[in-house]
């Protein structure tokens, strides 16, 4: 079995703004099916999506069995408001909002929870993130 363990069916791999604009307000089943078919042709039978706030990953999860693909997704990534993640995830500012997002993810059919704890790695500077990560206490509490 071959797997890809960090995909976002929503994104194209080149222009994230254009990729996001290509879906809402309606999901593009043709595009999702083309991508699932490409994975199938490459012999990949397991995909783990990082999720998105538009529902593309959930639709892909519904379609994936037609291609012999096991598809797992968190439904949407969860991030702290004011930090990295607003372009693709759902945000929280307090524990009550966080718990509500957990319940919504579960009701949506999430297979796991993705909590965004930092920005991106800065590939031009070893060990540097693009923004301050959540504190250890915040990660522990949430």
Model-based region annotation:
Residues 2-62, 84:
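Metal-associated gating/positioning segment near the N- to mid-region
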Residues 11-15, 80-83, 120-125:
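Short acidic/His/Gly/Ser-rich catalytic and metal-binding motifs that mark active-site loops
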Residues 24, 86-93:
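The substrate-binding groove and active-site-proximal loops of carbohydrate-active enzymes
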Residues 28, 53, 94, 132-135:
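Charged, low-complexity surface patches
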Residues 28-37, 92-106:
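Short, acidic/polar
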Residues 31-58, 68-79, 110-124:
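Divalent metal-dependent hydrolysis catalytic cores, especially in the metallo-beta-lactamase
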Residues 60-77, 130-142:
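Alpha-helix-loop-beta-strand connector modules within alpha/beta enzyme cores
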Residues 97-116, 121-142:
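Histidine/acidic residue-rich metal-binding segments in metalloenzymes
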């Amino acid at each position: 079995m071959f797997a890809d363990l960090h995909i976002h069916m929503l994104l194209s791999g080149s222009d994230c703004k254009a990729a996001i604009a290509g879906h809402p307000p309606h999901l593009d089943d043709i595009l999702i099916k083309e991508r699932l078919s490409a994975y199938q042709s490459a012999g990949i039978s397991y995909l783990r999506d990082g999720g998105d706030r538009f529902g593309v990953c959930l639709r892909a999860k519904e379609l994936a069995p037609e291609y012999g693909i096991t598809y797992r997704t968190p439904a949407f990534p969860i991030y702290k408001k004011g930090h990295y993640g607003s372009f693709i995830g759902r945000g929280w500012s307090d524990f009550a909002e966080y718990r509500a997002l957990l319940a919504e993810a579960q009701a949506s059919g999430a297979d796991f929870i993705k909590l965004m704890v930092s920005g991106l790695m800065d590939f031009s500077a070893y060990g540097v993130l693009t923004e301050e990560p959540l504190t250890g206490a915040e990660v522990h509490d949430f």
